[in-house]
C-alpha cells in the first residue's frame, strides 16, 4: 500500500516512473490501481483500460468508415498523465498486439509519463505477453513492482 501511495504522490507531483502490479485473480489489483487513479485524477489526467480493449480500439481504426487513425488512438493513450493498462496477458499475444503496446508505452517512455501494468501473470511471464522491450522500459528508472500474494477476496 505504501508503494501505491508513494507512486500516486509522485505522479501528482509531476514525477515519472512505472508500476507493475501482479497477483492472482481477486487479490485487489484493479481496486488498488483504481485508488491510484482516484488520487491522481483530481490534479492530472488518468486513463484506465484493459489491454484487449486498447487493442480493439486501435484495430477499429482499420475500418473503411473510421474517422480516426491508428496513430491518433495511440497518441490519446500515450499522452495522458497516467495510463493504467489492466488485464495484461489475456490478449492473444500476437506480434501486432505487442507492437501496439510497444508503440503506446515507448511514446510514454520518451515523454517520461508514468504507466501502471496490472496482470494475473507472474512478473517474469509478463515479457511473453507484451514483449521484453516493454518490460525493460517499465523497469527503467526505478520502476516499482507490487506482488499481491494472497488468496482471492471474492471467494
Model-predicted segments: where are they?
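Pre-Walker A (pre-P-loop) alpha-helix and adjacent loop at the N terminus of AAA/AAA+ ATPase modules
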Residues: 1-19
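Short glycine-rich substrate-engagement loop in P-loop NTPases that contacts/grips substrate
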Residues: 2, 41-79
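Walker A/P-loop nucleotide-binding motif
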Residues: 15-33
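Residue-level preference for the first positions of well-ordered beta-strands
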Residues: 16-20, 45-46, 82, 114-116
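P-loop NTPase Walker A phosphate-binding motif
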Residues: 31-43
